């Protein structure tokens, strides 16, 4: 069994989500061969050198799962792209490139966070290119902690404002982009998060039937994609 989740947006202000994640680590994930976390794991991350006690507790719980035999793979999201190798080493997880192709359920599957599919959101795409270039990343990681905290708060505030102002079509994936990206990677299944619109979409790629599986965000309930001998099963679960 393989589990895939995304968009937990872990933060101290939402202990219900944190407890649900810890329950997953101590429960279903213990029986999984691997756990994939496809971005926006934390609501914000300003650097491995600035871990709070809350974030350290999450890291330690992940390490326990990893030590028990479940492999953990973590992909950057738009909220936590400053997660680095130091955190991954401590948590016992592998940092996964976005995009990545893996073998899943007997086929090659493309994994993405999903934000790069939203090409109609021109303002966001411009900001992403700016923040993700190597020079910007180096500068961000070397800013004083106070400056990083201030910048993180500013970006989160602006992000919420922009999402409210923009149409749902703009902040969703661009329909034409999906088959193009899937064809470029030679896959018929894509799994991503980011949009907070869990669903399984059918489409055609290079004349062949294909599917796009969108993971759900954790808010009032959690979401997980389970892949086993029964196939691909996307389902919500209630927080205990």
UniProtKB/Swiss-Prot annotation:
Residues annotated for Mn(2+) 1 binding in this entry: 7, 9, 40, 196
Catalysis: reaction(s): UDP-2-N,3-O-bis[(3R)-3-hydroxytetradecanoyl]-alpha-D-glucosamine + H2O = 2-N,3-O-bis[(3R)-3-hydroxytetradecanoyl]-alpha-D-glucosaminyl 1-phosphate + UMP + 2 H(+)
Pfam families registered for this protein in UniProt: Metallophos (PF00149)
Amino acids binding Mn(2+) 2: 40, 78, 113, 194
CDD domains for this protein: MPP_YbbF-LpxH
GO molecular function: manganese ion binding; UDP-2,3-diacylglucosamine hydrolase activity
EC number: 3.6.1.54
Superkingdom, taxonomy of origin: Bacteria
Cofactor: how bound: Binds 2 Mn(2+) ions per subunit in a binuclear metal center.
UniProt GO BP: lipid A biosynthetic process
Gene Ontology CC annotation, any one: extrinsic component of plasma membrane
Cofactors (names): Mn(2+)
Pathway named in the protein's UniProt entry: Glycolipid biosynthesis; lipid IV(A) biosynthesis; lipid IV(A) from (3R)-3-hydroxytetradecanoyl-[acyl-carrier-protein] and UDP-N-acetyl-alpha-D-glucosamine: step 4/6
UniProt binding sites for substrate: 78-79, 121, 159, 166, 194
Subcellular location: Cell inner membrane
Enzyme class: hydrolase
Keyword list, A-Z: Cell inner membrane, Cell membrane, Hydrolase, Lipid A biosynthesis, Lipid biosynthesis, Lipid metabolism, Manganese, Membrane, Metal-binding
Membrane topology, as annotated: Peripheral membrane protein
HAMAP family hit by this protein: LpxH (MF_00575)
Family statement drawn from the similarity comment of this UniProt entry: Belongs to the LpxH family.
Functional note: Hydrolyzes the pyrophosphate bond of UDP-2,3-diacylglucosamine to yield 2,3-diacylglucosamine 1-phosphate (lipid X) and UMP by catalyzing the attack of water at the alpha-P atom. Involved in the biosynthesis of lipid A, a phosphorylated glycolipid that anchors the lipopolysaccharide to the outer membrane of the cell.
Protein name stated in the entry: UDP-2,3-diacylglucosamine hydrolase
Gene for this chain: lpxH
